[in-house]
Swiss-Prot record:
It is an enzyme of class 3 (hydrolase). The gene is ppaC. Its main location: cytoplasm. It comes from Streptococcus equi subsp. zooepidemicus (strain H70). GO terms for molecular function: inorganic diphosphate phosphatase activity; manganese ion binding. This is Probable manganese-dependent inorganic pyrophosphatase. Belongs to the PPase class C family. Binds 2 manganese ions per subunit. InterPro entries: DDH_dom (IPR001667), DHH_sf (IPR038763), DHHA2 (IPR004097), DHHA2_dom_sf (IPR038222), Mn-dep_inorganic_PyrPase (IPR022934), Oligoribo/pAp-PDE_c-di-AMP_PDE (IPR051319).
Length: 311
């Protein structure tokens, strides 16, 4: 078997980078696999903060597994093929570690698959370290903690599992950081949107979902000031329309999430706005609406859209 590539989803967030980096280490230590961690995009500013803090180099970016001479891959923090590497259907999926819904996914052969309804893929990878009695190095503990903090907004998201609190405390101790202090510093590092173009902003953390025959792009940006982001609304809408035309998305839903007050503004464009409105029981005014208490795409947006588009 050729070298196995380990990677998270396209437009990688902190959990995608952290879980793949840590699982690559575990695969070598516990399973004696010939693996290499790579990424499907450059780290965002939040992830770059975590990597720099713990002295870890970002994984190299690849666009094709076969171009790297790999015939097998391991996916972390995702399983849906539209969110994965470009030639995912041409290689064999050797394993998956994920915490999302399972959809748009099939394999020709059996595989290792660990999917749990917890706050982050990093939480699962940490559990695998413990199950296999592999010590967690300080830098990897820091990355796993960062992945958990990122995906749960410092354990405030409704996706947070009861076990994640204990995991966070243990990882913080292993990483040698104060949980709240480090967590807020990392999250704030990811809210610097002023330096991003509108095209970059809507692609920072975006995933495509196949919903009843529609390609729906759902993106999320974190901020401490929603109004500041909405000041760029006209330019953001222009960027959304451009990417919808070029990529063939039927609809685009952008979550602008206030990480301090735990609310989101939804900015949406596309052919099925009636379904978007029905999903959240709100009325879009000038293409946007407030969604109180919403911070999680995985739990508070995608399931609702899936149900509405399927109705």
């Amino acid at each position: 078997m050729s070298k196995i590539l380990v990677f998270g989803h396209q437009n990688p967030d902190t959990d995608a980078i952290a879980s793949s980096y840590a699982f690559d280490y575990l695969a070598k230590k516990a399973f004696d696999l010939d693996t290499e961690v790579v990424a499907l995009g450059d780290p965002n500013e939040e992830t770059a903060f975590a990597l720099d803090y713990f002295g870890v180099s970002a994984p190299r970016v690849v666009t094709s597994a076969k171009a790297e001479g790999a015939s097998h891959v391991i996916l972390t923090d995702h399983n849906e093929f539209p969110q994965s590497i470009s030639d995912i259907r041409e290689v064999e999926v050797y394993g998956i570690v994920d915490h999302h819904r399972v959809a748009n996914f099939e394999t020709a052969n059996p595989l290792y698959m660990r999917v749990e309804p917890v706050g982050s893929a990093s939480s699962i990878v940490y559990r695998l370290f413990k199950e296999n009695r592999v010590d967690v190095p300080k830098d990897i503990a820091g990355l796993l903690l960062s992945g958990l903090i990122s995906d749960t907004l410092l354990l405030k998201s409704p996706t947070t599992h009861a076990s994640d609190h204990r995991v966070a405390v243990e990882l913080a101790e292993l990483a040698g950081v104060k949980l709240e202090e480090y967590g807020m510093a990392m999250l704030k590092a990811g809210t610097n949107l002023a330096s991003k173009s509108e095209a970059e902003l809507i692609d920072i953390d975006a995933k495509t979902f196949e919903l009843n025959g529609n390609a729906v792009r759902v993106a999320q940006v974190n901020t401490v000031d929603i109004a500041e982001v909405l000041e760029r609304k006209e330019a953001i809408e222009a960027a959304i329309k451009e990417v919808m035309a070029s990529e063939g998305y039927s609809d685009f839903v952008l979550m602008i999430t206030d990480i301090v007050n735990s609310n989101s503004e939804i900015l949406a464009l596309g052919a099925n706005m009636d379904k978007v409105e029905a999903a959240f029981s709100f009325k879009l005014e000038d293409n946007h609406a407030f969604l109180a208490g919403a911070v999680s795409r995985k739990k508070q947006v995608v399931p609702q859209l899936t149900e509405s588009f399927g109705a």
